[in-house]
Amino acid sequence: MRLIQTLSSCLCTGITALFTACSQAPQSPIDSVDPFIGTGFHGHTYPGATAPYGAVQLSPDTRKGNWDACSGYHYSDSTLMGFSHTHLSGTGCIDLGDILFRPSLQTPLVFSHSDEKASPGYYSVNLREAGVLAELTTTPHVGIHRYTYKKETEATLVVDMDHLLDNEYMYEGWVKRTGDNELTGMRRTRGWVDNQYVFFVAQFSQPFSSMEQPSERQAVLTFDTTTGKPIVCKVGASIVNEENARLNLEQETDSYGFDFDAIHQATRSDWEKELDVITVEGGTEAERTNFYTALYHSKIIPNIASDVNGQYRRHDMSVATIPAGRRQFSTFSTWDTFRAWHPMMTLLDTTLVNDMVQSLLDMYDASGELPLWPLSAGETGTMIGYHSTSIIADAYLKGIRGYDAEHALEAMKISAEKNKKGADYYIKEGFIPTNIKKESVSCLLEFAYDDWCIAQMAKALGHMDDYETFIKRSQNFINVFDGSTRFFRGKRQDGNWETPFDPFAIGRSYTEATAWQYRFFTPHDVYGLTQLFGGREAFIADLDSLFMVTSEVVGDLVDVTGLVGQYAHGNEPSHHMAYLYSYVGQPWKTQEWTRRLLDEMYQPTPEGIIGNEDCGQMSAWYILSSLGFYSVCPGSNQFILTTPLFDKANMKLGNGKTLVITANQPDKNKYITKVTLNGEEISHCYITYDQLMQGGTLDFTLSATPDKRWGTAPEYAPYSYTEQPTVSIPYIANDLDLFEGEITAELKSTTPEAVIHYTLDGSEPDENAPVYSEPFVLKETTIIKAKGYKKGFVPSRTYSIQATKAVLRPALSIQPTKHGVAYTYYEGEFQWVADLQKAKVVETGTIPEPSILNAKLPDHFGYIFTGYIYAPEDGVYEFSTRSDDGSVLYIGKEKVVDNDASHAAIDATHPLTKRLPPLRLALFRGLRG
């Protein structure tokens, strides 16, 4: 098989480096960091200056308003708009870009990458056409600029609070002169999150000679630079108020005055300390650059949200003060980072972990729910699951407990009960109907894992009733497993599968993925998943296929990148999959694939991150995998072992101890034959958190050929909730949704020699129920329930499906007076079809058929069409709407197709008589078309 690599040559941009093997470690890890890595392709990182976890990220903005503008900078650009003080790193959504400074009236400013320099805490660019050298550094809350103008260049500086990276709504904002060398300002916006406040106080190394204000939110300053001295500007920022912005500025920079180099050196020292937490020896220069840049990227997010006096803005917009010694954090991409970044931090920085858990709990206290994706002082609601529960449970079960655990469990339980994204159906029915909610399969699978986390937390605290509730819910993944395809599939409310099914398609039932990329997501119960597949052999064959099938996908989704077969390293749902071989007795394949992914998915170039860096998750995968272990199931306290990338690594652990990791010639050997910790052999293919935190020496003995004995015995496999052989849930392969006359049903199980007992009256089957022996015919609407049994196996879950006979309801006896459909046209911003009813009617009329071609705007409009459908004969008809923003189709009073607020289409069937039933179609179009 040839690796299908999305890092094609056409993406490369002109930086070419030749790296050779070298056994010597660099003098300082900071010298191996390249902040330009990830600024090309879709990495969405920024090259500018920031302190570790800094509240200020001072970086150039080269574009806005499109997906590759998420960080404000893209390496393919050659002009910039200026330097703003807040940025996101590696995200898939755009926001921030606050407080833009531009050292020229020219816009945009032309630059060359050959004139850029970047290192942790420092960025510079020589803007030759504008005649100014721009240099940037930061402290945690202050951005520091140094502009060196050519003598013949007028020293002009534009301060722009109107600048936005995305189409945000500006509630208010202003810039004011508050001294001969001082400006203050603020703005409040609604973007990815509502009510984003930012305040600043800017002080300059010399008075400005003039100031003009083109608008209330802009200022143009001029300076006398005949002395030849550069202009240094210090900008203190806060999301609380102007007074705190000033206090941040004073406490973090007053002792340095306007000495740019001294401030830069202090921040560089902070970075040297942060990057010294893991040092590696051996490997190539390229691998060390990848490693230390990954470590750097893992320490710029989350961001400090509290000021130097401890004040911070809460999610209810109130201002509170944290206890001394603590920090409040925001910018958590929990859907991404629960997988590897947070488990990595439990090893490296337990103080940080405690602060983060306290921050999450404070967000719960202010809003009534643990956050999914908090930003600034609000919740974006982006992505799925409730993965704050994983973060908290993982910390608590590892003994990191600097918070009220009972309160944490309460927050976890309440957040899991919120009626969001189909959670009401998930709790009541055990699955989320795909005809009612989008992303139903992905949501269910991630809810199930999060519920397992809550169960473990409850058990540790002695709440066994809660444990039983949530551990039962954690097995709901079984309900959407289709044995006929061996995929998790979208299930309609009546128990029938969504059709047609294409595992290579970007479907409505999955989040940023195909069915392949969610096929193996049961991190808490991999053994249970193998039982659904029919056993180890079937599971291994399908896991092999993941990496071997075509990388073509049906549909367009920019997140699905870094494809090897259908494994997509550029997006997080795939990140654990190479490690699953260690659960089924083939750890040597884990070692093969992790090495290949390390080698081919990360490069020391701007395009070198194969997808969104995602707030440290892509980097954490690289760091942990290159050290030789990875957390597949946070909360289990286990890390799956794999082959290290480096000869030696030193980890400074969060408890003050040091772990030394050694391996013999990993450049030549990628297979494990033996692992010891402080001289004691580890036979399992995993190591525990407690073992790692002992410190000492973790030694890997490697070979050039696979050792198919090490770690292969079933008793050496990592944790799974299911411990005993279990019969897979039965299934019916054909669709029983609507049938005319009669239909045949055939029950099967992936478990060899399983005996299926079933009922046709809706009752629960047991071993006294009839034994299935051959297909049976249904002539009426019937609820089929089935359960699989086998000696020595735990019985399966009950399978339930409704076979529905089509009932042709008479249509209205009416004779339409016109051909076509009536329409009502609306304009505005809509999230749901119901929002149309609140909008102002722009136009009404009649057209031959439903169409949006006459819309007066390219986006932000909606239609409601009404009329009648002509059915040429009685029968069952199929309907679909192909809108990717939101649409709902009613026939009579029945909702037939529900694509509301969705970005994927769904089909439906409905019986019609030959007469004319009424139709109502409502749809809207947003920014994405």
What does each model-identified segment do?
Residues 674-676, 755-759, 878-880, 888-890:
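Beta-strand signatures of extracellular beta-sandwich domains
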Residues 151-153, 667-670, 749-755, 882-886:
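Short proline/glycine-enriched turn/loop motifs at strand-loop junctions of beta-rich domains
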Residues 747-749, 869-871, 875-889, 919:
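Aromatic-lined ligand-binding clefts that engage carbohydrates, nucleic acids, or primary amines
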Residues 20-21:
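C-terminal motif of bacterial Sec signal peptides marking the signal peptidase cleavage site
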Residues 230, 695, 742, 779-783, ...:
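Extracellular Ig-like/FN3 beta-sandwich strand-entry sites
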Residues 719-824, 829-834, 840-867, 890-892, ...:
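Short, compositionally stereotyped local motifs that mark structural "simplifiers"
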Residues 921-928:
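Short beta-strand-plus-loop segments that form exposed binding edges in beta-rich domains
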Residues 25-390, 396-445, 453-479, 485-488, ...:
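Accessory carbohydrate-recognition regions in carbohydrate-active enzymes
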